[in-house]
Amino acid sequence: TAALRSYLIEAAYHGLIGDFVSAQATMTKLAEIYPQNPLAPQALFEAALYCERRGAEFYPQAVVLHNDLATQYGTDPLFYYARLKQGNLLRSMNNFAGAQIVYENLINGFPTHEMRYIAELSRADCMLALAGNDFDGLADVAVILERLLDLPNLPLDFQAEAAQKWAFALIKSGSIEKAKEVLWLSADRFIGDGEKAVALGAAGRYWLARSMLQLGEIFEEQDNLAEARKVYRQVIAYNLPGRHIAISRVDQILE
C-alpha cells in the first residue's frame, strides 16, 4: 500500500542522511502498525540494524529488537539471521555465555540450515573466549572446529578461518605438533592449489596469512629455520596480509 511505501521511503531517507534514530523509529512504527504484514519482520530487522549503527551503547536495544522479531515471527526466514545478529551483538558486549546459547539453539534447531557453519564457528569463538587457559575447554573447542571443517560446502574463507582457530586452540592447550600439522595442511590446501589461493577472499587471505605466520613461528621455535624461511617466503610470494612481517622475519633468519 501507499502508506507502507511511505514508511519505507522515509526510513531509507533518514538512513541515507545518517539519522539512524529516526530511521529506527520509522521501521519500528511500521512493524507496530502492520504486525500481520509480510514486511513487518523485515521492518524489525532493519530497525535493529539502524539501532546498531547508533553505537555500542545501543547494542542492548538492538538485541531486544532482534529478539522481538524472533519471538513474534518464528517461521519467517529472517528468524535465523535475527538470532545470528543477536549472538554477534552479545559477543560485542562480551556476553560470550549468552551468545553461545543463542548459537547452540540455532545449531540444534536448524541442523540443515545453509548458514549453520556461521553459527558453528561463532559458537567456537565464544567457547574459545570462555575457555581461557582451561585445557579441557580448549580441547572441546578443538574438536568442534575439527568437525566444522568436515561440513559439506564450507566456503573457502571459512575453511581458512576455522583451521587457524583450530590450531590456535591446540597451541593454547599445549598440542604443538598437532597444531603444526593443522597449519601445514591448511597452508598446503591453499598454496598448493593455485585455484583455491586465487578464490580466497580478503578474509580468507587474512586467516591464511595468520596460519602461515604462526607455522613459521613454530618452525623457528623448533630451530627448523629452513622450513620457517620457506613458509615466510610463500607469504611474501602470494602477497598475503602480513607480508612485511614475513620479510622482516626472513631478514632476521638470514642475519
Could you say what each language-model-derived stretch is?
Residues 1-255:
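Acidic, polar-rich low-complexity tracts and alpha-helical solenoid repeat scaffolds
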